[in-house]
């Protein structure tokens, strides 16, 4: 999704890692709408919003249970899915680098599932300038070798975390644990709690904090 009137080498890119519904009962790939998450503000700000069809999501779902593993077999396949997401991410950024309209300012934005289960790609992909996590954190629901807990201390890039105090899906301990574990220097990580539930977060505050963060870490 690109803003109108973009010029050569002018676009920053925000790669979106969506919520759980895109791994369960997603819309058709041509029906994806950034406005569903209220993320159209990214496009209106003059940036491109990149929404890949990750393995296990949208039109690439083979078995929904792999993305929400409950058995040992599904857990084994989920671990493979982690590698698939890393490859999908690298290929997406390679593609952006091959197109003249995009510059090197590339950001990670994860919402819910994308702020919980896919953040390991931040360790393996060094081309991200910064990350924004909406209602994300560390989860104890799956073993450490899969949930990124072992990776988080090795992540050094700037990370903004926006969460709700009344979130019944992602309790306050989850983002606090991730924030404490991040290897990012203290001045380059930020955790904000709003008096809200899981989603939506207060829109005006979310927009202000997000755009300020992206602008702060661009080339």
PLM segments and residue spans:
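Short beta-strand-to-loop junctions in surface cap/lid or active-site-entrance loops
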Residues: 1-10
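C-terminal catalytic histidine-bearing segment of alpha/beta-hydrolase fold enzymes
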Residues: 184-219
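Cap/lid segment of the alpha/beta-hydrolase catalytic domain
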Residues: 20-87
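Short beta-strand/loop motif that positions the catalytic acidic residue
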Residues: 155, 161-163, 167
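Short beta-strand element of the alpha/beta-hydrolase
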Residues: 9-21
């Amino acid at each position: 999704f690109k803003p109108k009137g973009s010029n050569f080498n002018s676009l920053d890119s925000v790669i979106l890692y969506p919520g759980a519904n895109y791994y369960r009962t997603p819309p058709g790939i041509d029906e994806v709408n950034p406005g569903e998450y209220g993320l159209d503000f990214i496009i209106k700000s003059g940036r491109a919003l990149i929404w890949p069809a990750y393995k296990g999501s949208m039109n690439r779902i083979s078995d929904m249970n792999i993305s929400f593993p409950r058995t040992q077999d599904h857990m084994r396949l989920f671990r493979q899915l982690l590698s698939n997401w890393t490859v999908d991410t690298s290929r997406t950024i390679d593609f952006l680098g091959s197109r003249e309209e995009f510059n090197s300012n590339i950001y990670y934005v994860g919402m819910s599932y994308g702020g919980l289960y896919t953040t390991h790609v931040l360790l393996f992909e060094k081309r991200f300038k910064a990350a924004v996590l909406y209602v994300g954190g560390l989860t104890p629901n799956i073993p450490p070798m899969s949930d990124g807990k072992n990776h988080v201390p090795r992540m050094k890039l700037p990370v903004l975390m926006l969460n709700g105090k009344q979130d019944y899906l992602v309790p306050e301990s989850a983002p606090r644990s991730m924030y404490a574990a991040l290897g990012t220097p203290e001045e380059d990580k930020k955790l904000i709690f709003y008096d809200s539930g899981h989603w939506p977060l207060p829109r005006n505050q979310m927009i202000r904090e997000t755009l300020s963060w992206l602008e702060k870490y661009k080339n």
